Amino acid sequence: MSKKIGILTSGGDCAGLNTVIRAVTLRAVNKYNWQVYGIKDGTLGLMTNPLNIVELKPKDFDGHLMRMGGTFLGSNNKGNPFNSDISDQIIDGFKKTKLDALIGIGGDGSMKILQALTKKGGINFVGIPKTIDNDVKENELSIGYDTAVDTATNALDMLQPTAASHRRAMILEVMGRDAGHIALNAGIAGGADVILIPEIPYSLKSISRHIDRKSVV
């Protein structure tokens, strides 16, 4: 039996989103003969009148699109979907689409939102973890994390010549919020002298002493 599934991206953008959308579309259409619909701008696409959705075909994904960062469907992290009025609009919009299931690509916040909508509105929901923070539980690697670590490592590599030339201590701050995965792994790969992550308490005095010892050497 043919199925209709929807796919959306929610929250911040990252590398790899268009590739995931392509993989879902190719598998669903070519193997199962299902219809795939992209929902524009995250859950906002289910709140507009008319609904902001578009059918996706394998031919839509050319080489140029695959080289683009971000998500061609658009995304958003505005508003509060836990608000009853907003969640009701999203659920009503989903029902109007007559989709059999919804695939949501998002981070920990997006997963919580879509899970709540599932419980409230009976939406068949499949989550694909996407976050450079790599902080989605029960998941080893999230979409976007590897590229974030690689980018931060390259930044460290570029900082080191300037730091050495001017005898300066350089600080590179990376994203991650309450998760130190990017800082830890980029710091190791880039040869950082000190790595600070939110999971482990640290003392500024001990860090200062360590830097002083390094500067003497």
PLM feature segments, named:
Residues D13-V24, L46-M47, F82-D88, L102-Q115, ...:
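Short glycine/serine/threonine-rich phosphate/pyrophosphate-binding segments
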Residues V36, G93, A101-G106, K112-A116, ...:
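Accessory alpha-helical/coil subdomains and C-terminal extensions
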Residues S10-D13, I39-G45, N77-K78, G107-S110, ...:
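Short, ordered loop/turn segments at secondary-structure junctions
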Residues L46-G104, G109-S110, I143-N154:
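Glycine-rich oxoanion-binding loops at beta->alpha junctions
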Residues K4-G12, T71-N76, D100-G104, M170-E173:
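Short glycine-rich or small-residue beta-strand-to-loop segments that form or flank ligand, phosphate
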Residues R22-N30, N52-K59, A116-V126, I143-T147, ...:
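A glycine- and small-aliphatic-rich helix-loop capping segment at beta-alpha/alpha-beta transitions
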Residues S2-P50:
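N-terminal phosphate-binding or glycine-rich loops at protein starts, especially the Walker A/P-loop
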